[in-house]
Design a protein with these regions (language model features):
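Active-site beta-strand->loop->alpha-helix modules in alpha/beta enzyme cores, enriched
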Residues: 1-49, 98, 106-113, 128-130
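The feature marks non-catalytic terminal segments
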Residues: 16, 21, 55-131
Length: 131
């Protein structure tokens, strides 16, 4: 019942928003709620690019295969946005130093100062080659 409700909600969002990219939890996430959301997103958003993000506390074996270069302002904006989650304040896995260090690590993988890293669940696109 609950999974069907999630699927229907996602289908309604798809119709309303017509997204080009969906961000969900990585397939490496072991939290059962996160797994359910990712699985239902894969069903609801067929034909749309899906990228999985890392959750430090519940992702095991995550390695980013898609890296997006970001700058210092982006790092600060992400830290400020995450600070809005009051229920996570003070948690060891949810602090600005950890967030910044992950973005530095992903940046090193991309040979830049900072990057966001994603797991590729589905890429939909074209190479722009005309026949």
């Amino acid at each position: 019942q609950a999974r069907q409700e999630i699927l229907e909600y996602f289908l309604a969002l798809r119709e309303e928003l017509k997204p080009e990219v969906i961000f969900v939890h990585s397939n490496q996430d072991v939290h059962q709620d996160h797994q359910t959301m990712t699985q239902e997103a894969l069903r609801a958003f067929r034909g749309i690019t899906l990228l999985g993000f890392d959750v430090v506390r519940s992702s095991y074996g995550f390695f980013p295969h898609f890296l997006v270069e970001v700058d210092e302002a982006d790092v600060k904006a992400k830290i400020a946005a995450l600070a809005q989650y009051e229920t996570y304040r003070g948690k060891y896995y949810f602090n600005s130093e950890l967030t910044r260090s992950i973005m530095v690590r992903h940046g090193a993988l991309a040979e830049t100062a900072f990057a966001e890293g994603f797991d590729i669940l589905r890429i939909v696109g074209s190479f722009g080659v005309e026949a």
